From Swiss-Prot:
Glycans are attached at N45. PANTHER family: MANNOSE, PHOSPHOLIPASE, LECTIN RECEPTOR RELATED. Disulfide bonds join C27-C38, C55-C154, C129-C146. This is Snaclec A4. SUPFAM superfamilies: C-type lectin-like. Residues 1-23 form the signal peptide. One of its GO terms (molecular function) is toxin activity. Shows greater sequence similarity to the alpha than beta subunits compared to other heterodimer snaclecs. Expressed by the venom gland. GO terms for cellular component: extracellular region. InterPro entries: C-type_lectin-like (IPR001304), C-type_lectin-like/link_sf (IPR016186), C-type_lectin/snaclec_domain (IPR050111), C-type_lectin_CS (IPR018378), CTDL_fold (IPR016187).
Length: 156
C-alpha cells in the first residue's frame, strides 16, 4: 500500500510538472491563466457593447477585462502585445470600464460589477468607454467613442 501511494504521488508530481502549475487546466483552450482568472484577446473589431455581450457569451462569468492591480495591468498589456501583431499606430483594445453619467465620470464599478481598485487612465476629451492604447504599449487607459469597433480582451 505504501508503494502504491508513492507511485501515485510520483505520477501526480510528473503530471503537474508537465502541465505547468496546474492553473492553466481550469482555462478554456486558447485562454491564458493569471492568478485564478482566464484571459483571451480577440482579434475581432466590435463596439464596446458588442464586445461586452460577446464576452458574456464565451462563458457563464465572462466579461470584458477588469484590471484590479498594476500586476494584472502588466499581464494584460503583455498578453495584448503578444496576441495583436498587425496594428496601426493608433490602435486600441476595449476594457470593461465605461462612464455612466452625463458628466462623463466613470461608474463606480467594472462591467463585471467589481469595484475600481486600480486606475491608470490618460486625461483626454470626454468619451464614454475606456480602452488600452498601443502608443502606451497597452498600459494606459484612454477614453474612446463606444460606437467605434476595436479589438478587446475577455476575462473569466
Amino acid at each position: 500500500m505504501g508503494r502504491s501511494i508513492s507511485v501515485s504521488f510520483g505520477l501526480l508530481v510528473v503530471f503537474l510538472s508537465l502541465s505547468g502549475t496546474g492553473a492553466d487546466q481550469d482555462c478554456l483552450p486558447g485562454w491564458s491563466s493569471h492568478e485564478g482568472h482566464c484571459y483571451k484577446v480577440f482579434n475581432l473589431n466590435k463596439t464596446w457593447e458588442d464586445a461586452k455581450k460577446f464576452c458574456t457569451e464565451q462563458a457563464n462569468s465572462g466579461h470584458l477585462v477588469s484590471i484590479d492591480s498594476k500586476k494584472e495591468a502588466n499581464f494584460v498589456a503583455e498578453l495584448v502585445s503578444q496576441n495583436i501583431k498587425e496594428t496601426r499606430r493608433t490602435d486600441f483594445v476595449w476594457i470593461g470600464l465605461r462612464a455612466e453619467d452625463k458628466r462623463q465620470h466613470c461608474s463606480s464599478e467594472w462591467s463585471d460589477g467589481s469595484s475600481i481598485n486600480y486606475q491608470n487612465w490618460i486625461e483626454a476629451e470626454s468619451k464614454k468607454c475606456l480602452g488600452l492604447e498601443k502608443q502606451t504599449r497597452y498600459r494606459k487607459w484612454v477614453n474612446l467613442n463606444c460606437g467605434q469597433p476595436y479589438r478587446f480582451t475577455c476575462e473569466i
